[in-house]
Amino acid sequence: SDVLSDVCFGPMNQGKSREEAEEEAKKALLQVGFKEKNFKKSPFDLSGGQKKRVAIAGVLAMNPKILILDEPTAGLDPKGRDEILDQIAELHKVRGITIILVSHSMEDVAKYVERLIVVNHGKIAFDDIPKKVFAHYKELEEMGLAAPQITYIMHALKEKGLPVDPADTTVEEAKQDILHALREMNSSLLKGGVQND
């Protein structure tokens, strides 16, 4: 069996013809960044990242309304992890699929999700946008979860007097916020003038 046949399995089980299934499979494989030249490869000859892409494509070929992904980047290197998550975000945008991402990586969660639900001992502890959930970083720690590293850095900078938003959860947000704070501080220093002895 090859990759294309593997991905055709779901649509064919839904009653689609071989041609329809192949069309859906090819579309799904290309959407997850799987190159056409690899369609005829054996699934056993694929890298870890390629296998994850094929698995996601197999589900996408069935045109789901909701896609549940449990630790989809486990075992991948940082580059592969970012590629998979970028493609998942693109699928949400292009296809309008609701994606439920189960992850212990709070950096990934902060960067990619619109809504964050934290479950602790089978009960929902938090359900809000990431910024609001990560504001409770001390409670998250008590549950065995850490907020993104940038959350801790921003809180430390705020405590040291830098006028930043401690609710920043991504590196990009923090970078913009820190640059803005430094410009404001520099502007204040220039307005006040520098006294020489």
Segments predicted by a language model, with ranges:
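Conserved ABC ATPase "signature" region
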Residues: 20-37
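A short, surface-exposed alpha-helical micro-motif characterized by mixed small hydrophobic
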Residues: 109-111
